[in-house]
Amino acid sequence: MSYQQQQCKQPCQPPPVCPTPKCPEPCPPPKCPEPCPPPKCPQPCPPQQCQQKYPPVTPSPPCQSKYPPKSK
């Protein structure tokens, strides 16, 4: 028997079945970047004069302008 014949006698092995590729694990959620430090507050404005802080109260308009007369 030649060497080739002996080899042929061995039952052929079926080709190895490739296992179905496993889905890669989902990516971990991206790490949030560290939140920005709160912006530094600018120095508070010097206190304004009262007049600017509290504007003068405007007198309420007369009733006529509030409720115009109905057009006939």
UniProtKB/Swiss-Prot annotation:
Repeat recorded as keyword: yes
Region of interest called Disordered, as start-end residue ranges on this chain: 1-20, 42-72
Gene Ontology molecular functions: lipid binding
GO cellular component entries: cornified envelope; cytoplasm; cytosol; extracellular region; secretory granule; transport vesicle
Positions with biased composition (Low complexity): 1-11
Induction: During squamous differentiation of epidermal keratinocytes.
Keywords noted in UniProt: Antibiotic, Antimicrobial, Cytoplasmic vesicle, Disulfide bond, Lipid-binding, Repeat, Secreted
One Pfam family this sequence matches: SPRR2
Biological process, per Gene Ontology: antibacterial humoral response; defense response to Gram-positive bacterium; host-mediated regulation of intestinal microbiota composition
Keyword Heme among record annotations: no
InterPro entries: SPRR2 (IPR029142)
Origin: domain of life: Eukaryota
Modification(s) after translation: Forms five pairs of intrachain disulfide bonds.
Tissue expression pattern: Expressed in intestine; selectively expressed in goblet cells.
Main localization, broad class: secreted
Region (3 X 9 AA tandem repeats of P-K-C-P-[EQ]-P-C-P-P): 21-47
Localisation: Secreted; Secreted, Extracellular space; Cytoplasmic vesicle, Secretory vesicle
Homology family: Belongs to the cornifin (SPRR) family.
Known role: Gut bactericidal protein that selectively kills Gram-positive bacteria by binding to negatively charged lipids on bacterial membranes, leading to bacterial membrane permeabilization and disruption. Specifically binds lipids bearing negatively charged headgroups, such as phosphatidic acid, phosphatidylserine (PS), cardiolipin (CL), and phosphatidylinositol phosphates, but not to zwitterionic or neutral lipids. Induced by type-2 cytokines in response to helminth infection and is required to protect against helminth-induced bacterial invasion of intestinal tissue.
Full protein name: Small proline-rich protein 2A
Source species taxonomy: Eukaryota, Metazoa, Chordata, Craniata, Vertebrata
Gene that specifies this protein: SPRR2A
